[in-house]
């Protein structure tokens, strides 16, 4: 019932109503949040780094079953540029390594 009464109001009006109904101590607690704990701030760079590494290796996880499946011939599993050692690589333009 309360939801039906409040649903025509905009989110800004609902926020103003909520702040009006709360006691002043709760409002100041909502507006002035304490800073995060120092241990969490130290852990944040490691979380960001692990997320970036996961995104970097994500394509490898999807192609790993295809690369390891024995039903495909080796020419399909490994492109030609992977099958040659760097000093025996066939001559090709440098832009070919970008694709």
From Swiss-Prot:
- Write out the PTM section of this UniProt entry: Ubiquitinated; a fraction of P12I is degraded via the ubiquitin system.
In its UniProt record, a GO molecular function of this protein is: SH3 domain binding
Q: What is the effect of changing residue 88 to R?
A: In strain: Isolate ATK-1
What GO terms fall under cellular component here?
host cell endoplasmic reticulum membrane; host cell Golgi apparatus; membrane
- Residue ranges crossing the lipid bilayer per the database entry: 3-23, 48-68
Q: Which domain of life is it from?
A: Viruses
Q: Name one Pfam family in it.
A: p12I
Glycyl lysine isopeptide (Lys-Gly) (interchain with G-Cter in ubiquitin) crosslink location in chain: 88
- Entry's Gene Ontology BP terms: symbiont-mediated suppression of host antigen processing and presentation of peptide antigen via MHC class I
Find motif (SH3-binding) and give its ranges: 4-11, 33-38, 70-77, 88-93
Keywords, alphabetical: Evasion of host immunity by viral interleukin-like protein, Host endoplasmic reticulum, Host Golgi apparatus, Host membrane, Host-virus interaction, Inhibition of host adaptive immune response by virus, Inhibition of host MHC class I molecule presentation by virus, Isopeptide bond, Membrane, SH3-binding, Transmembrane, Transmembrane helix, Ubl conjugation, Viral immunoevasion
Q: Name the family the entry cites.
A: Belongs to the HTLV-1 accessory protein p12I family.
According to the record's subunit comment, the protein's assembly and interactions are: p12I is a homodimer. Interacts with human CANX, CALR, ATP6V0C, IL2RB, IL2RG. Binds to MHC-I heavy chains HLA-A2, HLA-B7 and HLA-Cw4.
| Other comments on record | Lys-88 seems to be associated with tropical spastic paraparesis/HTLV-1-associated myelopathy (TSP/HAM). HTLV-1 lineages are divided in four clades, A (Cosmopolitan), B (Central African group), C (Melanesian group) and D (New Central African group).
Q: What does this protein do?
A: p12I is a modulator of T-lymphocyte proliferation and immune function and may contribute to establish a persistent infection. Binds and down-modulates cell surface expression of interleukin-2 receptors IL2RB and IL2RG. Also down-modulates cell surface MHC-I molecules by binding to free immature MHC-I heavy chains in the ER and targeting them to the proteasome for degradation. Binding to IL2RB mediates recruitment of JAK1 and JAK3. As a result of this interaction, p12I increases DNA-binding and transcriptional activity of STAT5.
Name of this protein: Accessory protein p12I
Q: Which organism is it from?
A: Human T-cell leukemia virus 1 (strain Japan ATK-1 subtype A)
């Amino acid at each position: 019932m309360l939801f039906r009464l409040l649903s025509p109001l905009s989110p800004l009006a609902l926020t103003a109503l909520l702040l009006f109904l709360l006691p002043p101590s709760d409002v100041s607690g909502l507006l002035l949040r304490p800073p995060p704990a120092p241990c969490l701030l130290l852990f944040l760079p490691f979380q960001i780094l692990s997320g970036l590494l996961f995104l970097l290796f994500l394509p490898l996880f999807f192609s790993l079953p295809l690369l390891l499946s024995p039903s495909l011939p080796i020419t399909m599993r490994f492109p030609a540029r992977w099958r040659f050692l760097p000093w025996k690589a066939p001559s090709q333009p440098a832009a070919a390594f970008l694709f």
